[in-house]
Amino acid sequence: IENKLNLIVMDDNDKKRKLKVKSKVRSIHSSLAIEANSLSLESVESIVDNKMVLGDRKEIQEVKNANELYEHINEYNWKNESDFLKAHTLMMKYFEDDNGYYRNHGEEVKKGNEVIYTAPQSILVPSLMKSLFNFITENEKEIHPLILSSIFHYYFVYIHPFSDGNGRM
């Protein structure tokens, strides 16, 4: 009986591991698609599995960076602004000179040639982000984590704090 139970536990652990990998691949694929990465779900899965893929070098590196961040995700305290900036540095490795720093210029989101959103002035970004992290820390015991993460996401998108990579974060 003990051997059968061990087999069941091993099978269950394998299923959990496969589900985690599948979830990670889908998350990476969808967050990069927001930033116009054209790699297919299958290509993202292959990159995560350390297989060779034909495609745009920058897009492949975006997947590698996101995967590396996932591998180290438990090392970050997401309620800590400094850790959040470190995560952005890793996510944007090899791409931007200002990765891990808030933007120092205006930011607009466009659909074609039409401006559909203008972010707050760059001079306001550090104080807005500090206020957001303070809000999260002050309310983590009173507000359910799912609601709190939704609030964080809403204001993060509103502030649009980075020159690039906001959708990946």
Q: Model-predicted segments: where are they?
A:
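FIC/Doc superfamily catalytic core
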Residues: 1-169
